[in-house]
From Swiss-Prot:
GO biological process: photosynthesis
Chain residues that bind heme c: 15, 18-19, 61
Name of the protein: Cytochrome c6
Gene Ontology molecular function, alphabetical: electron transfer activity; heme binding; iron ion binding
Length: 89
């Protein structure tokens, strides 16, 4: 299983500028909460869809595949999934 501590660290260092607290500073209704991801995330709310979005980006969100390594991507996707599925944002 992915490392949630690494995921949190990766999120805070790379994602929180736009997604602090599970929010979205660019498109306010496209948050990282489960209901929003079910509605807006291509592929729905699941680990694979979150991983794909992190790797490839979309719209204003950059692709992170060239910046983060595979372990960091897996960890940050697992962290986002865990936060959202547990309603922790």
């Amino acid at each position: 299983s992915a490392d949630l501590a690494l995921g949190k660290q990766t999120f805070e260092a790379n994602c929180a500028a736009c997604h602090a607290g599970g929010n979205n500073s660019v498109i306010p209704d496209h948050t990282l909460r489960k209901a929003a991801m079910e509605q807006f995330l291509q592929g729905g709310f699941n680990l694979e869809a979150i991983t794909y979005q992190v790797e490839n980006g979309k719209g204003a969100m950059p692709a992170w595949s060239g910046t983060l390594d595979d372990d960091e991507i897996a960890a940050v996707a697992a962290y986002v999934y865990d936060q959202a599925s547990g309603d922790k944002w």
